[in-house]
């Protein structure tokens, strides 16, 4: 017979598995539709019209029209296509289900149109809202926070193709003063994360790792080098943190979402022309292209890092629906490659992984997620002790610093912001 503790853990097992599978399927469907639309906008349509895909006019035109389209969705839809991601953490309060269809449309348009944001925040918002709404009907005695945690875990597992990230993140958020053991509380979220990851794996495998030269043995000087790289990435990220609320306030003085997002799309188009096609979109596929291109120089990597970081700030400040983690990883890779080209004596594995750690830490302020992203992009077990050590001065540098998020004006209702 099972112990009462085991029976308690099993109570939410089936709902957790169902939520994990559903979270993954929603992500897969959204990404597939966005991929088809992206292929139409950036491959078939310019080919049919006889226009080069990297034509400046095409890049500016598509991104400007994308901004206008997203602005129309936000302006004229019930719920204004969900909350403004610039004002929200990755895991937030559930939104009304009526806002979800337009939020999904706004996300798909942004992903397909080349906006420098990832899918993580809107997908998280959708999955949390659905889990809370449906869960409250089916099992009303389970509180909203439980459904929120399960949906968040399932989404994280689906996004990264592994439950490890969810285990790391929730090991700190669920580790309170309760007498219930931590792993008892982690059981259902990990079930959701595992179900989400396995479901994603049936359709495609998220490919984060980069073909970077293997790192052999850790030296004492490598720790210093890694700490310096992380500090440089943090400094770059904090410039973006300073710019975001100011640009957000300036853009939102125009009040009209169509105008704000149209101008934002136009600026993104100009940045895309300067950085080239590799600086567009969420950044995961593009960072693979960046590493594969042997022709890039130190100045090219620097330009890509600056352009992508600027595009991330502009997209977030304008009100595009999307997440900041994936483009931040691209910025970290570009910074790391630039620093390796500038100082070849420091292995690329160190510069890239530590730059990712630093920039993702600025964006998320989550040490475990930052370590996870650095470790999966540069998968080398020899790096793990170094990354853990480098995390310490990086965390000290960011202690008490503002987060990459905009404080919502008090006079505005929760979900009416652009």
Curated annotation (Swiss-Prot):
Keyword Lipid metabolism among record annotations: no
Keywords: Cell membrane, Ion channel, Ion transport, Membrane, Transmembrane, Transmembrane helix, Transport
Molecular function in Gene Ontology: chloride transmembrane transporter activity; monoatomic ion channel activity
Sequence intervals crossing the membrane: 15-37, 57-79, 99-118, 149-171, 186-208, 221-243, 258-280, 301-323, 343-363, 376-398
Bilayer topology annotation: Multi-pass membrane protein
InterPro entries: Chloride_channel_YfeO, Cl-channel_core, ClC, ClC-type_chloride_channel
Gene3D superfamilies: Clc chloride channel
SUPFAM superfamilies: Clc chloride channel
Subcellular location: Cell membrane
Listed CDD domains: Voltage_gated_ClC (cd00400)
Annotated Gene Ontology cellular component terms: plasma membrane
Record has Membrane as a keyword: yes
NCBIfam families on file: PRK03655.1
Record HAMAP family: CLC_YfeO
Annotated family: Belongs to the chloride channel (TC 2.A.49) family.
Protein name per the record: Putative ion-transport protein YfeO
Naturally occurring in which organism (per UniProt): Shigella flexneri
Lineage: Bacteria, Pseudomonadati, Pseudomonadota, Gammaproteobacteria, Enterobacterales
């Amino acid at each position: 017979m099972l112990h009462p503790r085991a029976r308690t853990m099993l109570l939410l097992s089936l709902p957790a598995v169902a939520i994990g599978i559903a979270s993954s399927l929603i992500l897969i469907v959204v990404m597939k539709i966005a991929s088809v639309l992206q292929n139409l906008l950036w491959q078939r349509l310019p080919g049919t019209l006889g226009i080069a895909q990297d034509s400046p006019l095409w890049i500016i035109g598509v991104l400007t029209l994308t901004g206008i389209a997203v602005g129309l969705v936000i302006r004229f839809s019930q719920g204004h296509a969900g909350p403004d991601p610039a004002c929200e953490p990755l895991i937030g309060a559930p939104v009304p289900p009526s806002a979800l269809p337009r939020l999904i449309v706004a996300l798909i348009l942004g992903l397909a149109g080349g906006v420098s944001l990832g899918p993580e925040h809107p997908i998280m918002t959708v999955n949390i809202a659905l889990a809370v709404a449906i869960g409250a009907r089916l099992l009303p005695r389970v509180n909203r926070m439980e459904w929120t945690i399960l949906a968040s875990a399932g989404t994280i597992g689906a996004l990264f193709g592994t439950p490890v990230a969810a285990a790391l993140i929730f090991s700190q958020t669920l580790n309170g003063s309760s007498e219930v053991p931590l792993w008892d509380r982690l059981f259902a979220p990990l079930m959701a994360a595992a179900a989400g990851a396995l479901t994603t794996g049936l359709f495609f495998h998220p490919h984060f790792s980069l073909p970077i030269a293997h790192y052999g043995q850790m030296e004492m000087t490598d720790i210093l080098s890694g700490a310096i790289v992380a500090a440089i990435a943090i400094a770059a990220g904090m410039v973006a943190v300073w710019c975001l609320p100011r640009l957000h306030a300036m853009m939102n003085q125009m009040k009209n979402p169509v105008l704000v997002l149209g101008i934002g799309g136009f600026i993104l188009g100009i940045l895309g022309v300067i950085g080239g096609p590799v600086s567009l979109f969420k950044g995961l596929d593009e960072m693979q292209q960046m590493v594969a291109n042997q022709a890039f120089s130190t100045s090219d990597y620097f330009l890509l890092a600056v352009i992508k970081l600027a595009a991330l700030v502009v997209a977030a400040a304008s009100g595009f629906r999307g997440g900041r983690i994936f483009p931040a990883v691209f910025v970290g890779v570009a910074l790391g490659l630039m620093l390796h080209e500038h100082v070849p004596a420091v292995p690329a594995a160190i510069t890239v992984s530590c730059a990712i750690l630093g920039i993702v830490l600025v964006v998320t302020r989550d040490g475990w997620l930052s370590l996870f992203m650095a470790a999966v992009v540069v998968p080398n077990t020899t790096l793990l002790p170094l990354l853990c050590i480098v995390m310490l001065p990086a965390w000290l540098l960011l202690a008490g610093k503002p987060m990459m998020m905009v404080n919502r004006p008090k006079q505005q209702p929760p979900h009416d912001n652009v």
